Amino acid sequence: EYLAMLEAFTTGDPDGNGVNGDTYGVSAAGFIGTEAPYTNYLPEFYQDANPSFYKAEDGTWKDGFTEDSMKSALERMAAAYKEGVIDPTTLTNGTSDCRNKFYDDSFGVFTYWAGTWATNLKTNLEANGKDGELVALPPIAEVGQYLDRVPPVWCITSACENPEGVFKYFIEPMQDGGDVQFLWTYGVEGIHWSTAEETLFAGTENEKTYADGEFHMLENREKEGTQYTKAHIDPMLALVELANDPQEESVAAEAKESAQLFNDNCKAADLVPTTDEMSEYNGDLTTLKNELIAKVVMGEITVDDAYAQFESNHGAEWSQAIVDSLNK
């Protein structure tokens, strides 16, 4: 069913320009992500495969790239690429390239952040004169659950001359549940948000009128025709409850719905520890894996050729050294 949908986006005329077949089913910022869990841009093709290290059910660490599930994933991606449902510029795309193509209706399926980004995508489509209705897809049966990546964190570096001050005046008050957290979440009154009676985007199809005292985000100064969704802290991801949080009024329905769908259908990705062997070999190993994945998907080599090159170019050796170090 998923492939049939991609084929419809590819062979039909979803952008309504009167030309069949000048669009693609799915696009991504690479055939493999640049950060763990690596598979999130094309999960329907990876399915149960993991191109990197993971902890198995028996508690041991393994390199998923060496397993048959990864070979099957490569075959699925190569077949879809050959059929034309995967955007041929996927290898060189950045996330901004994908977003811009999505806003132009150049392809149909885009795996991206749940929550706030559902609103960002919708409003940018509408700003481009496109239909802003988006459908958040639950995972297909072969995927089972989406992977929730290990979250980014605020850090105080070892080079910091006053770490206590950074914690006291930044990190701690940013999560005070009060005025400072509100500032980091919603920004500055009159710049990012307001409670004044006013109409935004007057005379356009996105016109919105707010009553006096009604909290609302203001027009984004960097993206005309859209509203801010947050300042720094995503209100749906805050660690500390914010007193007098206007979230119900500020967070759009599509953001809440997509976040809930993801939360109901995800599992946490493994946090892979570092080892000396990981530091020594994983950079070159990852580069080799990425090169082989791209060559297979684009039809330059077969899956069997890729794994022969993985062996001859020390990939299997580096992989085993890292696995052994993780299982000590």
What are these regions (language model features)?
Residues 1-36, 53-97, 101, 156-168, ...:
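Helix-loop-helix "hinge/cap" segment bordering the ligand-binding cleft or interdomain interface
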Residues 293-328:
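Histidine-centered catalytic/metal-binding microenvironments
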